[in-house]
C-alpha cells in the first residue's frame, strides 16, 4: 500500500522544488558528536517553524552509515489506545517515495505487547510524516523506515516499546518525534522545556514523567521520548542536547509559542 501525504501544503510545501529549497535554507553546520548515534529527538511542527532545530539532529545523523530508521511519534487523533504500526508499503512526499522496512516492522510488532498493525490511524497523522522529507533530503531513496504512533504514552508503554526495540537485530536509528511546550509565552516555554531536557539527559523515566506532570509540560510526543530514553539507557548510552528554539523565532511574536528541541542519543 502507498500512503499519500496528509500534510503537504500545510506542514511543508507540496511542490518538490519549494520543499527542497526550504530544507536547503537551514544552513546548520555539520554536527560532530562523540560516539555512535543510535537515536534522536526531533520536532514535527510546520517545517518553516521547527525545521531549523530538527536539522541539528539530522545533520548529526547524516554522518552515520545506518540507513534504517524507527520513527515513533504521538497520535494526535487517537482512534485506538495502542501503539499503531504501519507495517508495510511506501509513503509518498513531494520528494518521492520512502519504503517501509517490513521485516523490521514485523519484528517490532512481534516483540511488543502494545503495538498493533493499524494503517488507518496513520492516514491523517503528521508526526512521522514530517520526518520523511528530512531523510529524503539527506539520503534520497537510500533509506527505509518503520512508522509507529502512540495513542497511549504512559510509562509502561514506553518501557515495552523500548524493550521491543532492543530486540531488533539489524542496525537502525530511533527517531522520537515530539514538539515541546505549547502555546505559552517564550520565557515560560524555555523554562519548562529546559527543565524537561534536563530530565531527558538523566535517562531517568520517573523523573521525566514527574517533570511532565508537575510543570505541566505539554510535550506531545513524550512517550516516544521516554521510549528512546529507556532504549538509550539499556544500550549504555547518553543523550546530547543540540538545540532549542520556539515558533516566535520565525513569527516574531513571543507571546504564545511552541517549543522545539533537538537531541541525539549516542553509545561509546
Curated annotation (Swiss-Prot):
Coiled-coil stretches noted in the UniProt entry, renumbered to this chain: none
Matches recorded under InterPro entries: MEMO1_fam
Superkingdom assignment: Archaea
Recorded family membership: Belongs to the MEMO1 family.
NCBIfam families (alphabetical): AmmeMemoSam_B, PRK00782.1
PANTHER family: PROTEIN MEMO1
Protein name, per record: MEMO1 family protein Ta0237
The species this protein was found in: Thermoplasma acidophilum (strain ATCC 25905 / DSM 1728 / JCM 9062 / NBRC 15155 / AMRC-C165)
Amino acid at each position: 500500500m502507498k500512503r499519500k501525504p496528509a500534510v503537504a501544503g500545510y506542514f511543508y510545501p507540496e511542490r518538490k522544488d519549494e520543499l527542497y529549497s526550504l530544507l536547503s535554507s537551514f544552513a546548520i553546520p555539520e554536527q560532530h558528536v562523540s560516539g555512535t548515534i543510535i537515536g534522536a529527538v526531533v520536532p514535527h511542527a510546520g517545517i518553516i517553524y521547527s525545521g531549523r532545530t530538527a536539522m541539528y539532529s539530522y545533520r548529526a545523523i547524516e554522518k552515520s552509515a545506518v540507513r534504517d530508521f524507527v520513527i515513533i511519534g504521538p497520535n494526535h487523533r487517537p482512534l485506538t489506545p495502542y501503539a499503531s504500526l504501519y507495517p508495510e508499503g511506501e509513503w509518498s512526499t513531494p520528494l518521492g517515495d520512502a519504503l517501509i522496512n517490513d521485516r523490521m516492522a514485523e519484528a517490532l510488532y512481534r516483540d511488543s505487547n502494545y503495538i498493533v498493525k493499524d494503517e488507518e490511524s496513520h492516514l491523517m497523522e503528521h508526526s512521522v510524516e514530517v520526518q520523511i522529507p528530512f531523510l529524503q533530503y539527506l539520503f534520497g531513496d537510500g533509506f527505509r523506515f518503520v512508522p509507529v504512533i502512540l495513542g497511549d504514552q504512559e510509562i509502561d508503554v514506553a518501557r515495552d516499546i523500548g524493550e521491543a526495540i532492543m530486540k531488533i537485530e539489524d542496525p537502525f536509528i530511533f527517531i522520537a518525534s515530539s514538539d515541546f511546550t505549547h502555546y505559552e509565552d517564550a520565557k515560560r516555554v524555555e523554562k519548562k522545556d529546559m527543565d524537561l531536557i534536563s530530565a531527558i539527559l538523566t535517562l531517568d523515566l520517573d523523573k521525566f514523567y514527574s517533570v511532565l506532570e508537575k510543570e505541566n509540560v505539554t510535550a506531545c510526543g513524550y512517550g516516544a521520548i521516554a521510549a528512546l530514553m529507556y532504549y538509550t539507557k539499556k544500550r549504555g548510552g547518553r543523550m546530547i542536547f543540540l538545540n532549542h528554539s520556539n515558533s516566535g523565532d520565525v513569527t516574531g511574536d513571543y507571546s504564545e509559542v511552541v517549543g522545539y528541541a533537538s537531541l541525539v542519543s549516542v553509545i561509546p
